[in-house]
């Protein structure tokens, strides 16, 4: 599929569908735990199909899991029944550790499962693009060096950080290449940790590396979609745009209207209904009100697509998800009616 044309189609669509990061809640219809899900390519592919069957979204998305890449490098990963796996400890502490760090082979850890998930999803889903997920270079390096430590090390030991980033980027390029060969139409590259950096440091320690990934792998048939759910990402917009990405997904605490106004008109901006306060909130009515508010604010920008501010957790109340989709559909339907009489 020509994904540049896909972007244009989304921009020109006056009746835009909702496009939340929705995959993990498939466990509710498959009666499996999150741990069982993320360790089975068949379960994950089936979950993607079931979500696609239930909701009209412009693409099918796989599972955001920021532990996979670091685990492949040898970091300790903790699995719990109903939580997304997490990395603990600090694999790289010194320059010597960074120098000794080996770039994993493709297929290490759970990367083979993630790639096979995409391959199986292409057998099940034929009516929309399929998007894989991976961590960005700085977010991967942060899990290898410890999230808090790496922020300090960008000042005190930048050479060590760059050593780890070089190896993380080399592996991520191989990993995304595996998704591409498996049939994915793009990948959502999650780089939230970079949102904690200053603009100059973000450029040096994240965006330049993401640009390398984009230059190597993005083409008309494969998109790199940039995800950063950190606070205040509007201040980092020049650094985000420098990555070469054309689709940006931002979090609940971003000024999404400022971001929409700041990107070229042929770039898509997705976001940013709060997961923690709205999707995981107390009532479907609150979901409806928050969704309507964001639609009224941004729906007249053609390159805006309403989404969740981050990936939606497995235990979300599906009534809330249903209300979100219905509210978006109703909002664009009413706009169409207004267009007919104005």
Regions found by a protein language model. Give the residues of each.
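A gly/proline- and charged-residue-enriched helix-loop-helix capping module
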Residues: 82-120
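Active-site loop segments of alpha/beta catalytic cores
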Residues: 1-26, 34, 104-342
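Short, flexible, mixed-charge acidic loops at enzyme active sites
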Residues: 76-81, 87-90, 142-151
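Surface-exposed strand-loop-strand hairpins of Gram-negative outer-membrane beta-barrel proteins
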Residues: 32-40
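Short active-site-proximal "capping" loops at secondary-structure junctions
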Residues: 23-28, 65-69
């Amino acid at each position: 599929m020509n994904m540049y044309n896909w972007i244009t189609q989304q921009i020109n669509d006056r009746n835009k569908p909702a496009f939340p990061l929705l995959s993990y809640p498939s466990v509710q219809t498959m009666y499996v735990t999150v741990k069982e899900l993320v360790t089975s390519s068949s379960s994950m592919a089936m979950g993607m199909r079931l979500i696609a069957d239930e909701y009209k979204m412009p693409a099918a998305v796989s599972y955001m899991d920021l532990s996979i890449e670091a685990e492949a490098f040898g970091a300790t990963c903790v699995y719990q029944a109903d939580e997304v796996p997490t990395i603990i400890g600090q694999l790289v502490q010194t320059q010597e550790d960074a120098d000794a760090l080996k770039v994993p082979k493709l297929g290490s850890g759970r990367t083979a499962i993630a790639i096979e998930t995409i391959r199986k999803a292409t057998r099940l889903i034929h009516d929309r693009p399929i998007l894989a997920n991976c961590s960005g270079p700085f977010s991967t390096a942060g899990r290898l060096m410890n999230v808090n430590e790496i922020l300090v090390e960008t000042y005190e030991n930048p050479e060590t950080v760059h050593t780890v980033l070089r190896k993380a980027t080399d592996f991520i390029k191989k990993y995304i290449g595996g998704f591409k060969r498996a049939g994915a139409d793009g990948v959502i590259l999650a780089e939230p940790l970079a949102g904690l950096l200053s603009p100059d440091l973000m450029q040096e320690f994240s965006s330049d590396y993401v640009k390398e990934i984009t230059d190597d792998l993005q083409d008309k048939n494969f998109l790199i979609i940039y995800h950063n759910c950190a606070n205040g990402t509007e201040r980092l917009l020049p650094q985000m745009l420098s990555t070469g990405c054309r689709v940006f997904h931002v979090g609940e605490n971003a000024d999404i209207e400022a971001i929409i106004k700041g990107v070229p008109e042929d770039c898509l901006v997705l976001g940013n209904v709060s997961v923690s306060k709205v999707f995981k909130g107390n009532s479907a009515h609150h979901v409806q009100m928050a969704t309507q508010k964001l639609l009224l604010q941004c729906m007249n920008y053609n390159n805006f697509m309403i989404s969740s501010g981050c990936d939606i957790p497995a235990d979300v109340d599906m009534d809330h998800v249903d209300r979100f989709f219905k509210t978006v559909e109703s909002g664009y339907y009413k706009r169409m009616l207004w267009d007919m009489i104005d």
